[in-house]
Amino acid sequence: MLMLIPFSLIAATFRTLKSPSQGRITVFIPKYLQRRHCLKASRAKGLLLISQQEKYKSSQNIKSKILSSVAFCALPLALLCSSSLVLADQKPKTNEGFYNPLAITKPDPLLPNSVQPLTPAQQLKLKAALDKLNQQAAARLAAGDSVGAYGIWNRELRLRRALGFQEEVEALGRVGAIAWSDNQRSQVQVITQRLLEIQQQILSKQSSLSLLNSLGFAFQQVREPRRAIATYEQILARTRLAKDVAATQATLRTLAELNLSWFDYTKAAANYQELLNYATQAGDRQSSLTYLQQLDYIYEKSKQYQQAVAVKQKLLGIYQNDPQLSLDLPSLRLAIGKNYQALNQLQAAFQNYQQAYNSAWTLQQYALAGDALRQLISLYRAQGQIDEALQTSQILVEAQQRASNIYGMMTAYDLIGQLYLNRANYSEALGAFQKGLELAQQLRYQETYFAQQIQQVNQRLSQ
């Protein structure tokens, strides 16, 4: 037996649900609720058919159940509608849809309600209050309350807008740096978005260089190198136009460091080359040295060995005329030799290795002399000049001995042993490996290796 319930009864129930702000709300019964109560709509008759298997036996019970269910479904919607204005203030979203605490616009007791710009006295008062907020936030973070800390900082950042872009940008950069080091990615994201908004607003204006510099630095603090570089390039164009040499050089230094730190060697080299030109024209010897060293580093890292040699030759001239820098001549000669070897200019490489060895030995830099000797031995072996390699290896042993480098002596004897093996001079090879074993036993390192070498040589001698 089926019981018929007028659909108008349920429709009337729907009409009783209202939102305080939106008026009437139409609420639909979800499918899972229809299945639960075995409800089926009949469009033709306008009736709902309810099976006898329902727990409720009377129309009154069914009405009560429907009212409860509909109210249960509609209540969250009603609450959502009635609080929509509050939520709009409390949880603003960015274009990407994430929560942006910097977009909250509700009034703040620290900010006067007047629409007029703040007077100088009001600005000083607000700035002092915001500095206190910054201190409170830092204390919260130190105490482990990161949520409370960033809540206070976000309030500070919102209020900083009343003090102008300069104050706001500096504060954004400061908090952004803290958030980045604290791994607060969402906080960094909203701060970066605000910096981009400010950048867009000042593009059409002839903003001060001070503001642009602050903006560029803030982009650095939130790890946005491309934005920072673009900002500094804008500054550079203006300083060049104004023929402000000091400001141009300062901006070039910033750009050079930025490009270098983000591994853009091409742009960094161009920046340092321009700085070198300025320093050379001004006769600034110390700055010239600094920029040449930076260029040398860049060319080494980018494996531009021809440019590296050219820069090192300029450094060589400076080192030779400065007694304090002359101690670095052996290492510079050694580096030049390696560059020439990488360029397959072996004769030039050999000459620089020889000069590196001679100057290092004269300055009693025996470890460095040993490095130069190893490079010479490598060249001799590559050219098949085994006798020269052996003679140089004997000097290498002495250099390592003077440097008190037991490990270096051990590897030198190993090298000598290998050279004698190449010439099938097994008795000399055996002597070299035995000396190497003695040193290995002192170090307790590679003892097995030398023992195996000795065993193999003895086997060949016994054949």
Segment roles from a protein language model:
Residues 2-36, 43, 51, 71, ...:
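N-terminal leader/linker segments that initiate helical-solenoid repeat arrays
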Residues 127-128, 147, 166, 206, ...:
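Residue signature of alpha-solenoid helical repeat architecture, marking inter-repeat boundaries
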Residues 122-124, 143, 161-165, 182, ...:
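Short coil/turn linkers that connect adjacent helices within long alpha-helical scaffolds
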Residues 157-158, 196-198, 234-238, 274-278, ...:
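Amphipathic alpha-helical segments of tetratricopeptide repeats
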Residues 131, 170, 210, 250, ...:
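Residue register of alpha-helical TPR repeats
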